[in-house]
Amino acid sequence: EIMPSLVGSEMCIRDRASMVLSLVSGYSLPLGVYYDTESVSGGRANALSAAERTACAVAFCETIRGAGYRAGVYSYASWFYNALNFANISKYNIWIAQYRDKLSFSYKYNIWQYTGSGRVNGISKPVDMNIG
């Protein structure tokens, strides 16, 4: 349910969101569809300003919402604090990744990803674990 943000313009993001909608059409997604924004080595979005990055997240979420799905933004705490204008995305669901025993995040959130090394019976590799 996460779409990585590897493109930089609002137009590209809307196109990407439309592609996601074609893939999820007909499915019930109670948690929604999330826009994944984070620093990626060599990623085009790394060069964007916080305002541009936020505008892309809003464009994605509004496109998803327009199709009747819940929309949200996924990232880690320092990215939410420093690379986005949180006030402009706070109306969407927030999925925060912070690998600690206790979450330290100043804003309202919906889902907390607390580890990337969880274990689940029947799955041999580590998995992300979330509370929401």
Regions found by a protein language model. Give the residues of each.
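Acidic (Asp/Glu)-rich catalytic clusters
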Residues: 20-29, 103-106
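Functionally critical loop-and-helix segments that line ligand-binding/catalytic clefts
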Residues: 87-132
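Single conserved hydrophobic/aromatic residue that forms the stacking wall/gate
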Residues: 1-8, 12-13
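Aromatic-lined carbohydrate-recognition surfaces of secreted/lumenal glycan-active proteins
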Residues: 64, 68-82
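Alpha-helical scaffold elements lining the catalytic groove of polysaccharide deacetylases
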Residues: 10, 14-25, 42-59, 63, ...
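Structural recognition of the beta-strand scaffold that forms the well-ordered cores
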Residues: 5, 31-37, 70-75, 93-96, ...
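Distinct, well-ordered alpha-helical segments
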Residues: 14-21, 80-89
